[in-house]
């Protein structure tokens, strides 16, 4: 490709020099440059194509990421710096797409990057949400959800002339398609993220400051929000309509493209493979069968055989609440044709396996989506070794007995291009100098281990952390209005707010630490504890946990005895942009879910990659991190997954007994201290207090004492910075296992078989 001359481009586009352009116009210039470069990249065009269908893709800002993948980042940055401009400030004009929420969507985004980087033919397929999940605001120390209006300012969507009709029970809608280019790192070709929208969508249904809207106007509201509130019947129906709209478009696209590439559809499995990312796209199975039979004349049994050989399913959860189940009557209302096929598939499954535990439709006429995926897909994978073992041994054991050959593990991964090169350029430079640049494409960081006792390298690593903290402090001051001490230990838990992730346990530690400082035990370094994450609007206890955290933040900030030594910050509207600022700066990575409940996690990998030390239960991928780095380079605590499973099985966990221990009672009752309750919302605090005291379904009280002890050991160890940085380096050196390039290679070698 021709060399880049930004000075010449500035003259051509704006008739002025690069030095005289303001940052907004430079941003427009760079967007145009990236679009033109990407447009010259042909699409990957292998015979067999992957369709990675996901309800969410948390792609983050793309300008810098795409410049890295297109190989022009360093050249652009150098020219801008020479002209007196800061690329990071220019990037601030980019709007982050609101197409995802948490780990599921971020994983999908990392996977698309790796699929393209490995030169594989594969597109992501999802929906173009106009307002995303929601934009989070904090009002009176409580979460307020408002629409996330991002489409008006975006520069990344490219219109596609494909359009499809989706038939519902008593009406039909038309879709339109937009694409986002996905270049691969160091690759001449690209893939795409295909996002379907509703041609008749009406943004006017959404009032400006509320996420409440008419859920019955299906022909106008289908693509307004990701995960619309399903706490009522209309919300549940809307979810099903939305999921069927997504998969019907995906299936029609897949079949059209397969025919264009030469398929006669009897051989469709030679031309296409579908990866179902969690259960939201499950209806692609009956929809493909419907299209093959009614639109293309293939016999039902053959259509089932074809689909069974081309659909694979990734399970992302052990929580029963997250394994989607829908009333058959609701599916019949959304699409009678699809419901009829599901009934036939259920009859087939029951004829093959007379076991009610594996039925697709149970005795209550409820459809179990994961069961359909397992019976009528050819592969099911977990996303961490422990998670897969739990699926095989307990949660999905009846299926494992039937289909052991379908089960495999594919431990999650992250793209190093974004999470080092883009998010932490100082660390990327250190790695280049120490071990060469191959890590950018291979993900192999193991050569770094030989520098574990190299004083110069450790000092430089410490300097990268200082630089990352400075960037984070600037971000927090400008975007969050928070001043963080320059010498603070940065302790971070950023993830969806959920009881099983146990933000409430970290809040109890904060109360303990507050009281300890009040008693005169001042830490040598101030400790800043940072939270980030959203709670589902209908999830009351999660909302209460946010309120507790924000009230603690205010309470501590207003106490002159404690504020110099302890700070609590909750990032408003945590997203990929915030993650790219906070994760490189972290010293401590909080991965404290109840053992057996986190499928994998990926923030644990990002923190590890950026030199934070992990404080964790042995849950999800934490187990694999611990095995890689060794006991001396990680901090583990808590009941094991087997112990937790036994407590659930025999029903012997009693929060009340633990609550009555004086040390624990002191912490829990602080929540309802009259003065503290006067600072917050008494109803919320009382409800959370009572839930922890009397229920504590995810067993925060079981682990709190050992958690406090372990955390205090972490803070003490931080004082020996030489030893701390050695541990950080060993963590980075062992993070290569968690490259999404490795994960995708395994998916392809063992499941997809793309050329």
For each of these PLM feature ranges, what is it?
Residues 1-755:
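A conserved ligand/cofactor-binding region detector
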């Amino acid at each position: 490709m021709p060399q880049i001359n930004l000075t010449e481009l500035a003259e051509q586009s704006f008739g002025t020099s690069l030095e005289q352009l303001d940052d907004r116009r430079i941003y427009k210039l760079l967007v145009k440059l990236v679009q033109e470069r990407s447009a010259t990249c042909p699409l990957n065009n292998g015979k067999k194509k992957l369709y990675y269908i996901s309800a969410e893709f948390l792609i983050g800002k793309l300008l810098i990421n795409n410049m890295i993948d297109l190989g022009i980042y360093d050249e652009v940055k150098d020219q801008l710096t020479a002209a007196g401009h800061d690329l990071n400030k220019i990037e601030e004009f980019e709007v982050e797409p609101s197409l995802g929420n948490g780990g599921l969507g971020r994983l999908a985004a990392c996977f698309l990057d790796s699929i393209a980087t490995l030169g594989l033919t594969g597109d992501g397929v999802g929906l173009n949400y106009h307002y995303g999940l929601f934009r989070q605001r904090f009002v009176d120390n409580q979460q307020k959800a408002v629409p996330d209006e991002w489409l008006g300012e975006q520069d990344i969507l490219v219109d596609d002339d494909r359009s499809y009709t989706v038939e519902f029970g008593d009406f039909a809608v038309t879709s339109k398609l937009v694409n986002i280019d996905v270049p691969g790192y160091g690759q001449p070709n690209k893939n795409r993220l295909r996002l379907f929208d509703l041609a008749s969508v009406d943004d006017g249904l959404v009032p400006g400051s509320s996420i409440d809207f008419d859920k019955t106007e299906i022909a106008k509201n289908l693509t307004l929000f990701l995960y619309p509130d399903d706490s009522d019947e209309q919300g549940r129906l809307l979810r099903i309509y939305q999921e069927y709209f997504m998969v019907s478009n995906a299936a029609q696209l897949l079949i059209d493209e397969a025919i264009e590439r030469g398929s006669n559809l009897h051989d469709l499995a030679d031309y296409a493979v579908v990866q179902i990312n969690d259960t939201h796209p499950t209806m692609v199975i009956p929809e493909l069968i419907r299209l093959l039979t009614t639109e293309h004349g293939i016999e039902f049994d053959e259509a089932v055989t074809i689909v069974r050989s081309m659909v694979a399913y990734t399970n992302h959860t052990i929580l029963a609440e997250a394994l989607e189940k829908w009333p058959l009557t609701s599916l019949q209302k959304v699409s009678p044709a699809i419901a009829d096929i599901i009934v036939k598939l259920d009859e087939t499954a029951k004829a093959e396996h007379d076991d009610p535990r594996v039925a697709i439709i149970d005795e209550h006429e409820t459809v179990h989506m994961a069961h359909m995926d397992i019976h009528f897909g050819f592969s099911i994978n977990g996303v961490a070794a422990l998670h897969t073992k739990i699926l095989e041994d307990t949660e999905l054991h009846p299926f494992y007995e039937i289909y052991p050959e379908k089960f495999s593990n594919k431990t999650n991964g992250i793209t190093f291009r974004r999470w080092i090169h883009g998010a932490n350029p100082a660390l990327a430079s250190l790695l280049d100098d120490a071990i060469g640049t191959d890590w950018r494409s291979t993900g192999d960081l193991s050569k770094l281990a030989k520098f574990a006792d190299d004083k110069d390298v450790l000092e430089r690593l410490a300097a990268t952390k200082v630089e990352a903290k400075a960037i984070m402090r600037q971000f927090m001051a400008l975007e969050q209005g928070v001043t963080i001490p320059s010498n603070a230990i940065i302790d971070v838990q950023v993830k969806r707010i959920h009881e099983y992730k146990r933000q409430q346990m970290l809040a109890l530690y904060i109360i303990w630490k507050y009281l300890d400082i009040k008693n005169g035990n001042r830490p040598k370094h101030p400790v800043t504890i940072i939270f980030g994450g959203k709670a589902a609007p209908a999830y009351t206890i999660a909302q209460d946990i946010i309120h507790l955290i924000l009230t603690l933040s205010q309470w501590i900030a207003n106490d002159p005895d404690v504020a110099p030594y302890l700070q609590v910050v909750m990032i408003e509207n945590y997203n990929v942009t915030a993650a790219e600022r906070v994760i490189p700066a972290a010293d401590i990575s909080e991965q404290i879910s109840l053992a057996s409940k986190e499928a994998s996690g990926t923030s644990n990998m990002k923190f590890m990659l950026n030199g934070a030390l992990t404080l964790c239960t042995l849950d999800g991928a934490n187990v694999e991190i611990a095995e890689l780095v060794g006991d001396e380079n990680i901090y583990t605590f808590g009941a094991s997954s087997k112990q937790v499973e036994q407590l659930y099985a025999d029903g012997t966990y009693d929060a009340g007994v633990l609550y009555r221990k004086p040390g624990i009672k002191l912490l829990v009752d602080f929540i309802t201290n009259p003065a503290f309750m006067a600072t917050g919302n008494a109803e919320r605090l009382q409800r959370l207090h009572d839930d922890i005291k009397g229920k504590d379904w995810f067993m925060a009280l079981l682990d709190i004492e050992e958690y406090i002890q372990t955390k205090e050991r972490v803070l003490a160890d931080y004082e020996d910075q030489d030893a701390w940085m050695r541990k950080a380096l060993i963590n980075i050196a062992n993070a290569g296992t968690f490259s999404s390039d490795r994960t995708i290679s395994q998916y392809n070698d063992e499941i997809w078989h793309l050329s």
